[in-house]
UniProtKB/Swiss-Prot annotation:
InterPro entries: A-D-PHexomutase_a/b/a-I (IPR005844), A-D-PHexomutase_a/b/a-I/II/III (IPR016055), A-D-PHexomutase_a/b/a-II (IPR005845), A-D-PHexomutase_a/b/a-III (IPR005846), A-D-PHexomutase_C (IPR005843), A-D-PHexomutase_C_sf (IPR036900), Alpha-D-phosphohexomutase_SF (IPR005841), GlmM_bact (IPR006352)
Keywords assigned: Isomerase, Magnesium, Metal-binding, Phosphoprotein
Catalytic residues identified in the record: 102 (phosphoserine intermediate)
Free-text function comment from the UniProt entry: Catalyzes the conversion of glucosamine-6-phosphate to glucosamine-1-phosphate.
Name assigned to this protein: Phosphoglucosamine mutase
Molecular function terms, GO-annotated: magnesium ion binding; phosphoglucosamine mutase activity; phosphomannomutase activity
Organism for this UniProt entry: Rhizorhabdus wittichii (strain DSM 6014 / CCUG 31198 / JCM 15750 / NBRC 105917 / EY 4224 / RW1) (Sphingomonas wittichii)
Residues bearing the modification Phosphoserine: 102
Pfam family name, one: PGM_PMM_II
Annotated transmembrane regions: none
Reactions mediated catalytically: alpha-D-glucosamine 1-phosphate = D-glucosamine 6-phosphate
Alphabetical list of PANTHER family matching this protein: PHOSPHOGLUCOMUTASE (ALPHA-D-GLUCOSE-1,6-BISPHOSPHATE-DEPENDENT) (PTHR42946:SF1), PHOSPHOHEXOSE MUTASE (PTHR42946)
Length: 445
């Protein structure tokens, strides 16, 4: 049976519409709290959020839910998703919660859950929590209701942890860095960490007002960052998304560097230092075939998973890899973090930039990607991928791309979208096949 609330990255949707209502958020708090109340000790949950307007409402609803079943709440305020994961483990909490819709606009919000080890919950845990949402709740006795308090030291603790991932013998002195925080969760901690390491810093996207998160800024819209890098003659530009678990880089010439290129860079660097485990990296089916070929030339493998950084992390843990990620900019380095951390990843890139002495435009473009095209088709309902004409269009494209490329068609786990991606050596064929499938999906939807 399909899950009603949880998608590929927790629960997400438009605020004040199911499942992102205060009522459901309170029930999630109760259900998750009940699921993680184990033993006789006092239970705690760490809660962070990004800067969107609805964060206050969702935070209050979750606190009501958790405290009603006897869990104490540690409130971090606006903090990156990886900070919540790190502090959940550091504070020995039973559960961590991030209130964010990541790269989505302010009208959406979401709930991501982390276990006491700082890793995102498994499908089994999420399914168990979802099952509890439909059952009666056992509330705590009056004397056992949980308490809530805010922790003011959270920012400093996270900045310290992030900086510890940067080589001690290096500094960023003399490096002109433009950072775009997307008016999101990292608007304070990211500039602070870079400044403390000595960077000549130019900050953008650091004035959140509740509705401007990810609005023409951040990792999903780098145009302003590209312009600023060129205008200021910066050495590099850093773009984070709303909850700072993604990283996209802009080189000194204003060109965008995606997650595939960044994974190639950090993997080769780690391999050279003897620090790469697993004999390669983990990425999703969306990563470019050029990355796979490049790694093979270095004697390294690419292990692919379905889309979602949590599935990347699960494969990394199961197979013994320590570097993985997604083309979209989730870069996971389990030597430093339990989930994608845009700031940690940025520091690893900056470390290699400083050590190499090369300009970013020369260092960061590790391989020539194959022509790749991704288009999204919005649909109102139903199952357009089961339509006969859509199935036929996909089969035709697969046949024509056999041996020279790949085709990935999937339903988004966070939005009502069908994502159509094709790549291959023939750019015109790739474009034609994507358009062919998108047209069929639109007619079916």
């Amino acid at each position: 049976m399909g899950r009603r609330y949880f998608g590929t990255d927790g629960i997400r949707g438009r605020t004040n519409e199911s499942p992102m209502t205060a009522e459901i958020a309170m029930k999630v708090g109760q259900a998750a709290g009940a699921h993680f109340v184990r033993g006789e000790h006092r239970h705690r949950v760490v809660i962070g959020k990004d800067t969107r307007l609805s964060g206050y409402m969702m935070e209050s609803a979750l606190v009501a839910g958790f405290t009603s079943v006897g869990m104490d709440c540690v409130l971090l305020g606006p903090m990156p998703t990886p900070a919540v994961a790190m502090l959940t483990r550091s504070m020995r909490a039973d559960l961590g919660v991030m209130i964010s819709a990541s790269h989505n606009m302010f009208a959406d919000n979401g709930i991501k859950l982390f276990g006491p080890d700082g890793y995102k919950l498994s499908d089994d845990d999420e399914t168990a929590i979802e099952a509890r949402l439909e059952k009666p709740v056992k509330l705590a006795a009056s004397a056992d209701i949980g308490r809530a308090h805010r922790v003011e030291s959270a920012r400093g603790r996270y900045v310290h942890a992030v900086k510890s991932s940067f080589p001690e013998h290096l500094r960023l002195d003399g490096l002109r860095v433009v950072i775009d925080c997307a008016h999101g969760a990292a608007y304070e901690v990211a500039p602070l960490a870079l400044w403390e390491l000595g960077a000549e810093l130019i900050s953008m996207g650091v004035n959140p007002n509740g509705v401007n998160i990810n609005d023409q800024c951040g990792s999903t819209d780098t145009r302003a960052l590209q312009d600023k890098v060129r205008e200021t003659r910066a050495d590099i530009g850093i773009a984070l998304d709303g909850d700072a678990d993604r990283l996209i880089i802009v080189d000194n010439e204003g060109r965008v560097v995606d997650g595939d290129q960044l994974m190639a860079l950090v993997a080769v660097g780690a391999h050279r230092r003897g620090e790469l485990r697993g004999g390669g990296i983990v990425a999703t089916v969306m990563s470019n075939l050029g990355l796979e070929r490049f790694l093979a030339e270095q004697g390294l493998s690419l292990h692919r998973t379905k889309v979602g950084d949590r599935y990347v992390v699960e494969a990394m843990r199961a197979e013994g890899f320590n570097i993985g990620g997604e083309q979209s900019g989730h870069i996971v380095m389990t030597d430093h973090a339990t989930t994608g951390d845009g700031l940690v990843a940025a520091l690893q890139v900056l470390a290699q930039l400083v050590e190499s002495g090369k300009p970013a435009s020369e260092l960061l473009h590790q391989f020539d990607p194959l022509p790749q095209l991704l288009k999204n088709v919005r649909f109102a309902g139903g199952e357009p991928l089961k339509d006969e004409k859509v199935i036929a269009a996909i089969a035709d494209a697969e046949e024509k791309l056999t041996g020279t490329g790949r085709l990935v068609i999937r339903k988004s786990g966070t939005e009502p979208l069908i994502r159509v991606m094709a790549e291959g050596e023939d750019k015109r064929l790739v474009e034609a096949m994507v358009d062919q499938i998108c047209d069929a999906v639109r007619k079916a939807a």
